[in-house]
Amino acid sequence: IGPTILMAAIALFSVGFLLNLDDVDAAPEEANYPEVEVIVVGQQWWWEYHYYLDGIEGASQPDFVTANEIVIPVNQDVRIYTTSRDVIHSFWIPRLNGKKDAVPGRTTPWVIQSNEIGRFAGQCTEFCGLSHAYMRMYTVSLSETDFLAWVANQLTIRDPLPEDDPNYEGEQLFISNCSRCHVVNGVTERDVNGTITSDSMAMYGNIEEFRNHSDGTLSQGKYTGAANLTSGAAPNLTHFATRSSYSGSFFELYPGAQEIADQGNYLGLPGSDYARGTLEAWLRNSPKEKPNAQPEQARGMPNLNLSEAQIDLLVDYLVTLD
């Protein structure tokens, strides 16, 4: 009789549990962009992220490209593919997952997921040159609503500023000094008449080009100027001011960014107090600020020998790129 009583008790609790399930709200609809995938590209000494909102396979180019910080929706698996433009790197966000090497000519699939909102620090863990210790990164996890807002903003391009805009001179300085390597979508690829002359995303190629590259001939990002760099690319700065860090996440753009992001206010960073002095120092003499970046060997940002007035104008312009 003992087993009979035991089975009856189990059945009773099971029925109660199943009835309670009927009272639970139906599962929420599948998140927007459920197929979002990201190519994670390592190069000396920073990380780049190519976002494909409807999946990578068959896509000719990414929907948008960002740098240093990979942004993901909370509680959603996001498939990434690690690869490299130059030497072997290793992508590691300790609080989210293990390590994955980024190897030229290979795209290694992986899944990352965060069950909490916040900003999580990472580090390249494969020695990749003298500035390896300064090759950092962040993963930022947002609520679904904030992630959708972030994506919508990243998809926008900028219009050239009119001559009467207070930041017009700064934009012109950027075009003449920085666009040899960096891109601001909608601005740096226009001709003298203001007409867009190329598709900024097309130059980043697709996953097949990364898979077929192993000998230093990768074409992605090898636009004018950056083609002379060892990696053939420099960070896309279209939405520079929406990121909490720069220069391989070695410098914080906003004081207190960690606490702000952990409180779920990452989207509120633009327009808040920023570390102007640090950004000025970076533009004044970047090789001095980031050790062993080797700009003389086409790695890292060189000293542009800007005047103090030019530095002020450039900083004023960069922090408007939200």
Describe the function of each predicted region.
Residues 1-179, 183-232, 240, 247-297, ...:
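Non-transmembrane, membrane-proximal soluble domains of secreted or membrane proteins
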Residues 237:
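"…together with the soluble PPM/PP2C metallo-phosphatase catalytic core" -> "…together
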Residues 316-321:
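Aromatic- and Gly/Pro-enriched helix-to-coil junctions and flexible linker segments
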